[in-house]
Amino acid sequence: MKRLFIYAAIAAAAIGSMTSCSDFLEVEPVGKMSEPDFLNQEGVSRLITGMYATLHNDSYFEGTLTNYAYGDVMGGSANKGSNFTDQPDFTSLETYTFAADNSYLSVKWKSCYNGVFFANNLINVAKQVETELTAVPGQSKDYFTETIAQARFFRAFWHFEVVKLFGAAVPYVNDEDVAANVNP
């Protein structure tokens, strides 16, 4: 009987100790920002900065605003040079023999719709905190209207970049339809 009591006490202690560390395991990562972090004026300002950051791209040929690959090379102002095995996707742009899986076109498409996504995301977040943005202390202008106007400009700008390259038959993505039409 004494042995049965000891085994039962050990089993109860083992089961009780297994449930004690759940709070320790559910700690939020320090460097991670969640959606509530953006639902204020400072968060909206961070989203505006992120939207402007979509203008900069480290790649000279693909998603950049210079449109070197699509304007100069395809227009005949620049030649790719070298031989046909050097950057075959670039050669196909120069000779107008490209396919839908051309890496330069794919990256340009994705970078443009990434800019559209940032603008639409900013519009959705700004609408959630409209009352806070409308009356910003120390500012005479309406911060909400200015934010929405900047986001709509960027959305139009990125759509125009897509239309310049792919023609008028490209999907228009507004702030209600954020996640669709990201891939060509």
Protein language model regions, located:
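Terminal processing/anchoring signals of secreted or surface-associated proteins
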Residues: 1, 21-23, 51, 119, ...
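Bacterial Sec-dependent N-terminal signal peptides
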Residues: 1-30
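Membrane-proximal, proline-rich intrinsically disordered regions
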Residues: 21-71, 97-98
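Proline-centered turn/helix-capping motifs that create local helix->coil transitions or kinks
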Residues: 23, 163-171
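Short, hydrophobic secondary-structure boundary micro-motifs
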Residues: 28, 63-64, 132, 171-175
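Short linear capping/connector segments at secondary-structure termini
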Residues: 30-33, 135-140, 173-181
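Conserved, well-structured interaction surfaces
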Residues: 45, 85-166, 182-183
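Active-site substrate-recognition loop segments, prototypically the cytochrome P450 B′-helix/B-C loop
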Residues: 75-79
